[in-house]
Each structure stands twice: as C-alpha cells, then as structure tokens.
Amino acid sequence: MADITDIKTILYTEKTLGLQEQGVVVIQTSPKMTKNGLKEVLREYFGVTPLRVNSLRMDGKVKRFKGRVGVRNDFKKFYVKLPDGVSLENGEA
C-alpha cells in the first residue's frame, strides 16, 4: 500500500508552473509508488480525486565528488491532472 511518506515533493520549475495553469501538478515520489497508489494517497490525505495520472521513471544521474563516482537516487515523476478549481498549493488541496 502506498503512503504519504513516498511523496518526496511537488516540483516547481518553469515547465511545471506552465502546466499548473492547465490544472496539471507534477509530483516527485519514490520509485515504488504506483499510479493507483498515488490516486489513493491524494484521495485519502488531500481529498482530491485526480482526473488523469501519467508517470515516468527517472534514473539517478551519475555525479563525481572528490574524484569518486556516485549515483543520485532514482525517482518517479507523476503528472496529475486535477479537476477545475482544485490545486495542491503548499501541499494542501
């Protein structure tokens, strides 16, 4: 079962702010989160039923630090279409 702790952040970039005008919110989560799990979390904790959820898996970037190679954590991004007049500003519906 998905949990609210699997949601890392709501992304705020130029691209996502443009999408918010169309009612789409971009959420970054742990890789184990599923579409149905995210819908369940949004209904339970925010009281919002999304119209559509699209997901994509992002591999962690390879980065160098002090001569050593490391890898950042993998994550999933979800594009969530919300009903008109509903937003998730500041983590609240």
From Swiss-Prot:
Originating gene: rplW
Q: What biological-process terms (Gene Ontology) are attached?
A: translation
GO CC terms? ribonucleoprotein complex; ribosome
Its biological purpose: One of the early assembly proteins it binds 23S rRNA. One of the proteins that surrounds the polypeptide exit tunnel on the outside of the ribosome. Forms the main docking site for trigger factor binding to the ribosome.
Among NCBIfam families, the record links this protein to: PRK05738.2-2 (NF004362)
Q: What is the protein name for this chain? A: Large ribosomal subunit protein uL23
Q: Which GO terms describe its molecular function?
A: rRNA binding; structural constituent of ribosome
Is Ribosomal protein given among the entry's keywords? Answer: yes
User: Pfam families per the record?
Assistant: Ribosomal_L23 (PF00276)
The family note in this entry says:
Belongs to the universal ribosomal protein uL23 family.
Specify whether rRNA-binding is a keyword of the entry: yes
Q: Which UniProt keywords apply?
A: Ribonucleoprotein, Ribosomal protein, RNA-binding, rRNA-binding
Determine the domain of life of the protein's source.
Bacteria
Source organism per entry reads Campylobacter fetus subsp. fetus (strain 82-40)
Q: What Gene3D superfamilies does the record point to?
A: 3.30.70.330
This protein's assembly is summarised as: Part of the 50S ribosomal subunit. Contacts protein L29, and trigger factor when it is bound to the ribosome.
